[in-house]
Each structure stands twice: as C-alpha cells, then as structure tokens.
C-alpha cells in the first residue's frame, strides 16, 4: 500500500481515541458532572497565596487566559503555568468584594508546582460512608453529644455561621478557649423509609468542644531567618525583610519558636521591640524595629515548605531540626540528647493497643526524614496533633557524624510562663463544595464536550512540554495504580464524573500514542514520513535498532511509574 494509506491506517487508532474522548465528554455533560468551584478554602503558611494575603472565601475569576475557572483548572494552571515569571490570578475578595489581579509564583520544593491553596469546604461535616466527621483522639471526637455525619454548623458561640470562612475565623480567634458549636441535623427515625420528595425534619444540637493542646518533648530549636512575609501585615509595615532574624522580643530572648506566637498574642495591639539581625551581602547589622502584633484572622496550614507561623506579625521563620536547648525535667532531658544534635528523622510508635487500628494514622511503620518531606514546625504543629494516648516518637539523632535512636513520650507544650499552647484545629472534617453542572441542551453538551476534549488534549501536550523544559518533575506522572485510584474517586461522584475522567484518559492515550517513539504509532509515522521524503523505506537494521531502543525506553518508563505508584520511588 502507498505511504498515505499506511499513514491513514496508523492514524486511525489516535483518531478513534479523540472521538471516544469527545463522545464520553458529551455524554458526561448530558448526564451532569460535579465541579469544585475555584474558591480558596485555606492557604499554606509560606506559600505564594499566603504571602499575597489570599483568604478563605476568595473567588478566582480568571487564571491566565482562562475565565470562570474550576478548581481543577487552578491545579493544572499552576502545574503547567509560567514558573519563572509567575501566573496571573484575578481574585474577588470575600472580605469586601473587591476585584484585583495578582501574580503568584508557584513553589516547587515538593516536586510539583504549588501556590499553597486548599479547595473550598461546606459548613457541613463529611457524610461519606465509612468516613467519620471527626478525627480520632481529637477534642471534636471526645465532645458530648457526638458530632454526626452530615451535621451542618449553624452557630459557634454567639456567631451565626454562613460559610466556611466564618468557621475558620472563629476557630482562629478562640484557639485557646472551649467553643460551643450548634449544629443542624436531620432527624432519622428508625424503620422510616427515606423520602427525597419531602423536606427532611431537622433539629439543632449544641456541642461543647475543648481546645487542642500542642505537644512537646522538651526540645527547643533555634528560630531561623524570616522566609515569608504576608502583604499588608504588621511585619511588612515595619519594614521587616526576608532573611532577617529575630534575636529578642522586648529585650528578652526569643526562646522556643513554637511558643513565640502564643506569647505575641498576649501583646495584641501593643507595640513591641524586636532586635533584628539583618544581612546584606557579606555584612551583618543589628537594628531595632517597633511593631504591633495584630489578631490572626484565620487558621494556619503548616506544610514542609512552611516555617513556624508567627501569624500576629504576618511572617514565617525557618526552624531547622537542630537542638538548641533541652528543657529540664522534660522527657528529652532524661535521655541521650544534647544541644547541637541534629534530628534526622522521626517515627511514630503507637501503643500496643492501637498498632492494628486502621483509623490510627500514627501506626505508620516508616521513619519520616526531615527535609523536603517534613519540617520541624509541620511535625510539631500538625503531625503531633490527634495521636493516640501514650504514643511515643522514635528520633534518629545525628551527633559528630554518628547516629543513634532515642524514643520519647510527649507532654503538653507550655510557654516560658507555664501557659498551655493550643492549636486552632479541633479535628472537624468538612465536606468539600461540589456544584452540579448539566448541559441545558444537546447542543450545549456538544459544545462542552468539545471544549473538554480540547482542554484534555492540550493538557497532555503542555505537561509533556513542561517536563521537557524541566519545570515539572518526571515524578509527577502516574501509572496504573494511580489511574485506578483516581477513577475510583471519580466514580464515587457519579457516572458523569467518571466519563470526564475517561475523557482525560483517552486524550492521554491519543497524544502519548502519537509521540515519535518506536513501537508507538508516532514512531511508525516517523518512519513513513522518512519513506515518503526519501522515496524508499529506512533500512531494516535501522528500524530494528530504533525498535529495540523504543522497547527499552517504554519498559523503563513502565517500571518507573509503577515504582512511583507503589511508593518505591519518592515523588518529592
């Protein structure tokens, strides 16, 4: 057969993948799909969104050239956006309805570009089967009467709750106090069949929830330099700079970085004097800065990229896992830990009664190294919350080039005055916001299906281009295990969501199959183009050599993505 005919035959598979993608997307929008709106649920301390001052409830109106984006458009827009010059976001502020455009530069510390935002949440607690609305060992789980799946929070203390933003603000404000949470719940009568045509009968319940104390081992680390400053914060107004290091507060040593925010909150609205070490090139200078701490408006999300949050100043500071002080009479003082020791990794050791518990997250058998996977603030302020009583932590300690293991119990964290230090998290699990989107007509479904198919095809192309440019790591790809996991998640929301996922998968196959790699249709197309130009086929020896090279490449790639899926290769 002629070269054009063979090209048409080879292209048929790719064309069918595109057609199937279009058909599945069209059917999906005829059935209806669930979309997560592009609203900020929370920001990660030290991330680009946190630095720019984005807040829960802020709505993203535009990302680059994409109007009215969905949250998944934000995820792909950040991953595949301009990492060098940043990505343009048009935001409607929840605080005052003001619309503004900001440029956010994604952080790639964790391997995948991120701006540090979480998706929006309802005021309703999760109600998925097999999921509890409260974290185990949390104050919310211990509260009486108990929280139930599907409870909707309508009031906290005396504040009426209209959105998750209200909840977050109250949790931040009353972090160190008990709160009374009023929920609205559906009355379920035993033996009565469910009737979706009738408005369900509801009742209200007032539940008192205690604050969450932070944990401690008696290990004090040194406060490092400032690594992030929020726009519009007291720190920015006082001319603090990234790289500055706080040496003292009102003439007193900084002390434990984990208790500094608690001490600053006792001086809200009052001026304090900070002694600052400022570096400029090779020179170092000392200066005094006056700043007035302000009440934090929202809770903190601490991640590996985060330093310790000093929210009342609007800064985050680096804290390395190197021991500066071992407190007297603390668990660490009784064992072989000294100032100058570096903590290499940690491993949770749950009590024997909890080692087989599926719900207990501390039963992980792997040690977690500090670095890209974990920071000291994240470990202490997030990882140590909601653990089973009597859970110990095994520390790998490095001293003079040698390592040894130390196992420690934890105690409640107290500041220099003996006051307990609390986290703003109470252990409540909120349902994500989903909006149901269904085409108004068949022509509308065709239009949406066409756009979904084009977006999926371009997504694969842009992802591959970013990998080639080195802006997205190869560890961002997923294999069969990851595909099955995401397909299962999509199927939980309905057949429409599953079809949208299959649209993306079919588009992936179309683009990948047409890459110029021997054994794939794209590789055969290259040989046919060569034959069409030269008027003769490539030599059999060349074809065999390239075919074996393509086989080795594909097998290596398959093993690599399988290793990522199974956790044998770290994604960070």
Language model: regions and residue ranges:
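Interdomain regulatory linker/hinge segments that flank or connect interaction modules
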Residues: 1-22, 63-111, 156-212, 249-308, ...
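Internal alpha-helical transmembrane segments
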Residues: 1-47, 68, 124-125, 133-134, ...
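Short extracytoplasmic/periplasmic juxtamembrane "stem" segments immediately C-terminal to an N-terminal membrane anchor
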Residues: 39-61
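Short, well-structured beta-strand-loop connectors
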Residues: 55-62, 148-155, 241-248, 338-345
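Transmembrane helix boundary and interhelical junction motifs in multipass membrane proteins
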Residues: 515-525
């Amino acid at each position: 057969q002629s070269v054009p005919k063979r090209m048409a035959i080879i292209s048929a598979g790719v064309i069918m993948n595109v057609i199937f993608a279009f058909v599945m997307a069209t059917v999906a929008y005829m059935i209806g799909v669930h979309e997560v709106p592009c609203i900020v649920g929370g920001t990660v301390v030290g991330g680009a969104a946190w630095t720019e001052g984005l807040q829960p409830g802020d709505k993203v109106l535009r990302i680059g050239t994409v109007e009215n984006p969905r949250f998944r458009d934000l995820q792909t827009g950040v991953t595949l956006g301009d990492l060098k010059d940043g990505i343009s976001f048009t935001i409607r502020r929840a605080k005052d309805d003001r619309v503004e455009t900001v440029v956010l530069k994604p952080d790639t510390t964790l391997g995948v570009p991120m701006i540090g935002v979480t998706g929006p949440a309802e005021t309703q607690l999760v109600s998925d089967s097999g999921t509890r609305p409260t974290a185990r060992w949390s104050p919310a789980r211990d509260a009486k009467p108990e929280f139930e799946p599907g409870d909707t929070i309508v009031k906290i203390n005396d504040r009426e709750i209209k959105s998750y933003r209200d909840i977050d603000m109250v949790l931040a404000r009353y972090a160190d106090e008990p709160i009374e949470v009023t929920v609205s719940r559906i009355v379920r009568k035993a033996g009565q069949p469910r009737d979706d045509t009738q408005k369900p009968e509801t009742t209200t319940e007032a539940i008192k929830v205690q604050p969450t104390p932070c944990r401690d081992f008696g290990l004090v680390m040194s406060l490092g330099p400032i690594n992030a400053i929020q726009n519009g914060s007291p720190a920015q107004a006082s001319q603090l700079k990234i790289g500055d290091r706080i040496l003292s507060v009102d003439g007193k040593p900084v002390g434990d970085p984990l208790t500094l925010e608690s001490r600053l909150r006792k001086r809200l609205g009052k001026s304090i004097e900070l002694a600052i070490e400022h570096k400029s090139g090779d020179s170092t200078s000392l200066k005094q800065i006056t700043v007035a701490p302000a009440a934090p408006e929202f809770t903190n999300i601490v991640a590996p990229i985060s330093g310790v949050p000093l929210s009342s100043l609007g800064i985050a500071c680096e804290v390395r896992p190197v021991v500066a002080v071992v407190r007297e009479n603390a668990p660490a003082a009784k064992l072989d830990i000294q100032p100058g020791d570096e903590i290499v990794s940690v491993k949770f050791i749950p009590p024997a009664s909890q080692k087989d518990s599926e719900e207990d997250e501390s039963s992980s058998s792997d040690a977690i190294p500090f670095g890209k996977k974990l920071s000291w603030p994240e470990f202490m302020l997030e990882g140590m919350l909601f653990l089973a009583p009597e859970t110990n932590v095994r520390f790998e300690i490095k001293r003079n080039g040698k390592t040894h293991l130390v196992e420690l119990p934890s105690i409640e964290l107290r500041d220099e005055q003996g006051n307990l230090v609390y986290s703003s998290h109470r252990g409540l699990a909120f349902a994500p916001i989903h909006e149901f989107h269904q085409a108004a007509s068949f022509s509308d479904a065709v239009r949406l299906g066409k756009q979904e198919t084009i977006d999926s095809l371009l997504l694969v192309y842009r992802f591959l281009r970013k990998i080639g440019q080195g802006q997205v790591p190869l560890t961002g790809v997923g294999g069969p295990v990851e595909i099955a996991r995401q397909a299962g998640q999509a199927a939980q929301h309905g057949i429409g969501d599953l079809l949208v996922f299959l649209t993306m998968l079919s588009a992936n196959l179309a683009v990948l199959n047409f890459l110029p790699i021997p054994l794939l249709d794209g590789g055969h197309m290259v040989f046919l183009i060569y034959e069409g130009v030269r008027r003769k086929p490539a030599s059999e020896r060349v074809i065999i050599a390239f075919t074996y090279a393509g086989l080795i490449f594909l097998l290596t790639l398959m093993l690599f993505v399988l290793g990522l899926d199974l956790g044998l290769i770290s994604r960070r």
